[in-house]
Amino acid sequence: MTFSKQLFLYLFFLFPLLHASHPQQCSSSSCGRDDVHVRFPFWLLSKQPELCGHAGFNLQCTASPKTALKLPNSGTFLVREIDYLSQQIRLYDPENCLARKLLTFDISRSPFSALYLVSYTFLSCPNEVAKSSRFDSIPCLGNSTTSFLATTSLDLAKSMLPSCQIVKTLDVPVSRRVIAKKSRFSTDVNDKDLWLKWDSPSCSDCERDFLRCGFRSNTSLQVKCFPFENSGYNTEPQVLKIILLSIIGPLTIFATCIAVGVCTSERFASLIQRNVAIAALQPNEVIVTTGLDESIIESYKKTELGESRRLPGNNDDIVCPICLSEYASKETVRCIPECDHCFHSECIDVWLKIHGSCPLCRNSPSPARQAV
């Protein structure tokens, strides 16, 4: 074999190896051109792999298209802004009636918490009373006979009794502390955005250093900082990549010119045909990630925790790895066969319906075990 043929074949097999040594990173995505940018710990359900985000941080695109977050027990909200450095997310109601969702708002089963809480008292009043009091009502909650009012002053709310009835007093997540206004009712509770924060996973250090945050490995829920491929920082892998490309580039041009002559020979044509035949016998492996049927999930063992809150088997965790909440007595946990990892039953049920694998070790139970 001549030197030119050896050089061509060397480069032919070298390029796939170089590409394999630098796997594609999880790049940011968005639902629309002017919409929020989505990156770790968030991930878009229809546009990014599940390994690009953390459990509980999955977003989805609406038909608008807008970015939406579905909170357990609280409904779906649209995302107006994500501050990755401060680890805050700003939400608003797509139906422009935030007050209605606040009456049943609950984020205890999500990874989010409030920046600040302001106590609001909601009242229902006959329309005649509301109009005569000259207080602003919340339009989207009222009807032909009843109006709804909201105030940060409990004393003001009590002064409306017995003509009005207190519906509920609740804490509303806001972006800053608010001083209660004792002299008036307000409709701004319906106009405000919800401000939530997350403490885990902690990626603020990565954002501060202009690095991307991600899982340490495919089998770990721990996170670390990685350099962006296009961040412009002079990291060692990037320098090595530039050196390799500066050497391979001229060699590629030289090998291409020689390959034009080589391709005319029957021997080279035979080599190509043989490689194609071998490749045809080796189909690419396709990995499809699907969730499990509810019947299979229900077959996995459930256990009610006692006063010791000790998990079955050799598990010594004190918090659920999915929702990051501590286990409590009388709570129900479900354990995955084979790996024996345990979680809150309501958390792992939702996870397995989407992913079909353990969120800790990423192993899927074998068909034989699922049928048990």
From Swiss-Prot:
Gene3D superfamilies the record matches: Zinc/RING finger domain, C3HC4 (zinc finger)
Q: Which GO terms describe its biological process?
A: protein ubiquitination
PANTHER family, from UniProt? RING-H2 FINGER PROTEIN ATL21A-RELATED, RING/U-BOX SUPERFAMILY PROTEIN
> Which parts of this protein are zinc fingers (RING-type)?
320-362
Q: How does it sit in the membrane?
A: Single-pass membrane protein
Coiled-coil residues = none
Q: What cellular component terms from Gene Ontology apply here?
A: membrane
One MF term in the entry's GO annotations: zinc ion binding
Q: Where are the transmembrane segments?
A: 242-262
What gene name does this entry carry?
A: ATL21A
The EC number(s) this enzyme carries: 2.3.2.27
Chief localization: membrane
Domains (record comment): The RING-type zinc finger domain mediates binding to an E2 ubiquitin-conjugating enzyme.
Query: Which pathway is this protein assigned to?
Result: Protein modification; protein ubiquitination
- Write out the annotated subcellular location: Membrane
Top-level taxon of origin = Eukaryota
Sorted alphabetically, the keyword list is: Membrane, Metal-binding, Signal, Transferase, Transmembrane, Transmembrane helix, Ubl conjugation pathway, Zinc, Zinc-finger
What InterPro entries does UniProt report for this protein, alphabetically? ATL20-22-like, WAK_GUB, Znf_RING, Znf_RING/FYVE/PHD
Tell me what organism the protein belongs to: Arabidopsis thaliana (Mouse-ear cress)
Name of the protein in question: Putative RING-H2 finger protein ATL21A
User: What is the annotated signal peptide range for this record?
Assistant: 1-20
